[in-house]
């Protein structure tokens, strides 16, 4: 009985998301679960060139849009 209870606790911990992660798009199809609570997309000349976790700095030619909800960088 203790083994069953321990197994249920472990499965619950692994399945629950305690709000410390966010799911970000890497491409149109693929996503990644990130520890950082921020997603970004880099845009240049009206084309999205990169997506991922975190919030990198912008430059004159590259605009970066950062957001903080699941799959918000689409």
From Swiss-Prot:
Listed GO MF terms: toxin activity
Sections of the chain in a coiled coil: none
One GO CC annotation: extracellular region
SUPFAM superfamilies: Snake toxin-like
Entry's localization field: Secreted
Tissue expression from the record: Expressed by the venom gland.
Family annotation (InterPro entries): Snake_toxin-like_sf, Snake_toxin_con_site, Toxin_cobra-type
Signal sequence residues: 1-21
Keyword terms: Disulfide bond, Secreted, Signal, Toxin
A Pfam family of this chain: Toxin_cobra-type
Family: Belongs to the three-finger toxin family. Short-chain subfamily.
Protein name: Three-finger toxin MALT0065C
UniProt lineage: Eukaryota, Metazoa, Chordata, Craniata, Vertebrata
């Amino acid at each position: 009985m203790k083994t069953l209870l321990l197994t249920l606790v472990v499965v619950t911990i692994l399945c629950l998301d305690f709000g410390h992660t966010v799911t970000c798009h890497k491409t149109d199809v693929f996503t990644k679960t990130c520890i950082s609570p921020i997603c970004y997309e880099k845009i240049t000349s009206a084309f999205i060139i990169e997506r991922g976790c975190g919030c990198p700095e912008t430059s004159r030619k590259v605009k970066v849009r950062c957001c903080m909800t699941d799959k918000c960088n689409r």
